[in-house]
Amino acid sequence: MTKFIFVTGGVVSSLGKGITAASLGRLLKDRGLSVTIQKFDPYLNVDPGTMSPYQHGEVFVTDDGAETDLDLGHYERFIDINLNKYSNVTAGKVYSHVLKKERRGDYLGGTVQVIPHITNEIKERLLLAGESTNADVVITEIGGTTGDIESLPFIEAIRQIRSDLSRENVMYIHCTLLPFIKAAGEMKTKPTQHSVKELRGLGIQPDLIVVRTEYEMTQDLKDKIALFCDIPEQNVIECRDAESLYEIPLQLSKQHMDDLVIKRLDLNAKYDTQLDEWKHLLDVVNHLDGEITIGLVGKYVSLQDAYLSVVEALKHAGYPLHKDINVKWIDSSEVTDENAAEFLKDVDGILVPGGFGYRASEGKISAIRYARENNVPYFGICLGMQLATVEFARNVLGLEGAHSAELDPETPYPVIDLLPEQKDIEDLGGTLRLGLYPSEVKEGTLAYDIYGKKEIEERHRHRYEFNNDYREQMEDNGLVFSGVSPDGRRIEMVELPKNDFFFACQFHPEFLSRPNRPQPIFKAFIEAANKYKEAKENK
């Protein structure tokens, strides 16, 4: 039977519940267990797809096209699995589904209430995560902080699930903060005690407590937490601040967290903990030699979580070269043709990531022009590909005023236009072209050199696409369309052979990058940036 582990958090937000859950998933997977993981978010949006990146950070897209919380990116990268739409459940999605059922008459005229209707819907979503994957273990992170009013239905649902499935199939892990009071010169356990008391008041006794701390815990502190929170001392796990997120699984393993979980749930682990691959990765991360500077030109750079998967993918690509990636954050609203060199003269590569809306788009186009004209390695993702074709149309083809129809509906040259199937859609939420789609790669191109095969699959998130009316004209002037959809209708990749590395794609390759397996385009881009840097230094 599938076992269920619930990870809750107390005291403050941003404790690292997601990293804790992902790290535990990695440990259990390395013991030969199949693991899936999900996030319950208590906000009332149906999904984060229409939320501002300033509010939420990046939107992570799964293979089956779900727009989800960025924590799912951590889950996939740590555990090296591909998640599905059941891996992110919001209060908005739950309430919306319950209300649709009520309108259909599914409740036979009964009064619809939080208990049992909302809690039952939450439990159904929880069980679907296990049923859709046949996993040995489902790890569920509960978003928010214990005691938050909006998360109470989720807490109640996971309390009930213990009775539904029996105690031996359910485990609760609670993450708390152990603050250091500088004036007193000591760490305080009281916030942890009160957080656990709050959780117990809601009917949940944690089996294991993960304590986030800046400094090493003494045995006395562990004993005190164990006493007041009514758990064995060995079930108090220290989680120290770390320079690299990839240290966390090893921290937890040293304290036998996986052994405690396996024993508590009577899991049939096939192997002892080795983590050799993870230890090798961490050894590489801790011994990087030199750095490569990438100019990331975007409009949400004041909140770096808006580009989290892109940055992680860049780092992954640096590891085989033993290079650290220094991301230079460049606000595209400040970039113009006249000052682009000031912003970009010191970078080894330029990346324009995905985005929406007209604001700050001209600065991205200026950065792309600088990269093309100065032979600086360029990599464009989604909007970064669309604007690369806009820049080419304006400055190579001479089509003054060329633009994307999304950004300038009145443009005389709509190089980028609305997807045909989007013409009659009015709603914004959940209506993009989303998820994993195949592409065909043209032989004899940089794209083929990168992937080494004729067919690939990557994740997409877009509403607009390249307008094929301009394809022949661009090809005649040197732009190569190296990747297309299987029907040949949609452009997926473009490149400029006369430059050392000028490459862009409509899809989001960052979502499939792994720390031990860099995504091929990112790997090629960082290799090109490294060569560019070495050439500059040897001049």
Swiss-Prot record:
Binding site for CTP: 13, 148-150, 188-193, 224
Enzyme's top EC category: ligase
Known pathway: Pyrimidine metabolism; CTP biosynthesis via de novo pathway; CTP from UDP: step 2/2
Keywords (A to Z) from UniProt: ATP-binding, Glutamine amidotransferase, Ligase, Magnesium, Metal-binding, Nucleotide-binding, Pyrimidine biosynthesis
Residues the record lists as binding ATP: 14-19, 71, 240-242
Keyword Ribonucleoprotein: no
GO MF assignments: ATP binding; CTP synthase activity; glutaminase activity; identical protein binding; metal ion binding
Catalytic activity: UTP + L-glutamine + ATP + H2O = CTP + L-glutamate + ADP + phosphate + 2 H(+); L-glutamine + H2O = L-glutamate + NH4(+); UTP + NH4(+) + ATP = CTP + ADP + phosphate + 2 H(+)
Binding of UTP, residues: 13, 188-193, 224
Role noted for this protein: Catalyzes the ATP-dependent amination of UTP to CTP with either L-glutamine or ammonia as the source of nitrogen. Regulates intracellular CTP levels through interactions with the four ribonucleotide triphosphates.
Protein family membership: Belongs to the CTP synthase family.
Record's protein name: CTP synthase
